[in-house]
Amino acid sequence: MLKGAVTALITPFDDNGAIDEKAFCNFVEWQITQGINGVSPVGTTGESPTLTHEEHKRIIELCVEQVAKRVPVVAGAGSNSTSEAVELAKHAEKAGADAVLVVTPYYNRPNQRGLYTHFSSIAKAISIPIIIYNIPSRSVIDMAVETMRDLCRDFKNIIGVKDATGKIERASEQREKCGKDFVQLSGDDCTALGFNAHGGVGCISVSSNVAPKLCAQLHAACLCSDYKTALKLNDLLMPLNRAVFIEPSPAGIKYAAAKLGLCGTIVRSPIVPLSDTTKKIIDEALYHAGLLKE
C-alpha cells in the first residue's frame, strides 16, 4: 500500500528555461537517499500546467529510470480533457510508473456525473492504480464523498485519494464511505498531521522537496500512532509548510531547494520569482527546521 511521505517533485529548469535533466535525476536520487517513501512527478509542484506534453512524458520516463523500483512513482496524469488524461495515464503506465495521480478536471467545472465519467474512462484505459486528486482551491470543483465511493466500488484500480480540501474530517468521511483500505493521502502539509489522525496514511508533500527525512519521520510516527513524536516534527516543519505558499507555488519551494543547493530557482511564467520579503521568511523557516545552519 502507498503510504508515508511522497514528494510532489519540483521540475528543475536551466538558465534557458529548459528542463535540467541532470539536476532532476540528481534530485530524485537525493530524495531516495534521504529516506522518502515515494515520489510524484509532474503535478502542480512540478509545474505541469506549463510543461508541454513531450516534456511531461520525458520527466516521467526520467523519474522511473532513476528510481529503478526503489520507491513508488506516482505520475501526474491529469487534464481537464478526458481524452488527454487517458493519453497521459496510458503513457505513465507504459513508462513504468507504479500509479497515476489524476486531478479533478479544472476550469470546465463538470458535475458529479461528469467526474464519475472522467475517472471511469481513465480506469478502463489502464491497469495500474489511480489516486484521485481532489483540490477544490485549484480545480473549483469538489468531488463528493459519494462519488468517490462509487468510483472505488466500481473500479478496483481506483485505490485512493490525495485530499487537498484542507478539511481533516474528510478522512473520516471517506474512510466511512470508501472503506478502511482506501488509501488516503493528505495533499496539504499544514493539515496532514490531523488528517492522519482521522485515518490518513501519509501525504503527497511539497515541503518534503527540501525536508524528505523530516517528513518521512513525521509520517512514520503517525503510522505507528506516535503522535507525540509526530507533533514535535510538525512543530519544526510548520513554518516551512506555510512559508513556501506565501507566494504562488512552486516559486517558494524552488527557492528553498536552491538555498540547499539542490536546484536553481527558475520558474515558468506566469509564476514569477519571489520577493525579497518572502525569501527572508523562507530562510527563517529553513533555519527553524534545522535545514540551514548559522
From Swiss-Prot:
Pfam families: DHDPS
GO BP terms, alphabetized: diaminopimelate biosynthetic process; lysine biosynthetic process via diaminopimelate
Molecular function via GO: 4-hydroxy-tetrahydrodipicolinate synthase activity
Reactions listed under catalytic activity: L-aspartate 4-semialdehyde + pyruvate = (2S,4S)-4-hydroxy-2,3,4,5-tetrahydrodipicolinate + H2O + H(+)
PROSITE patterns attached to this UniProt entry: DHDPS_2
Residues annotated for pyruvate binding in this entry: 45, 204
Gene3D superfamilies per UniProt: Aldolase class I
Pathway stated in the Swiss-Prot or TrEMBL entry: Amino-acid biosynthesis; L-lysine biosynthesis via DAP pathway; (S)-tetrahydrodipicolinate from L-aspartate: step 3/4
Site positions for Part of a proton relay during catalysis: 44, 107
Keyword Heme: no
EC number of the protein: 4.3.3.7
Location of this chain's protein in the cell: Cytoplasm
PANTHER family: 4-HYDROXY-2-OXOGLUTARATE ALDOLASE, MITOCHONDRIAL, DIHYDRODIPICOLINATE SYNTHASE
Entry function: Catalyzes the condensation of (S)-aspartate-beta-semialdehyde [(S)-ASA] and pyruvate to 4-hydroxy-tetrahydrodipicolinate (HTPA).
Assembly mode: Homotetramer; dimer of dimers.
Protein name as catalogued: 4-hydroxy-tetrahydrodipicolinate synthase
Record organism: Bartonella henselae (strain ATCC 49882 / DSM 28221 / CCUG 30454 / Houston 1) (Rochalimaea henselae)
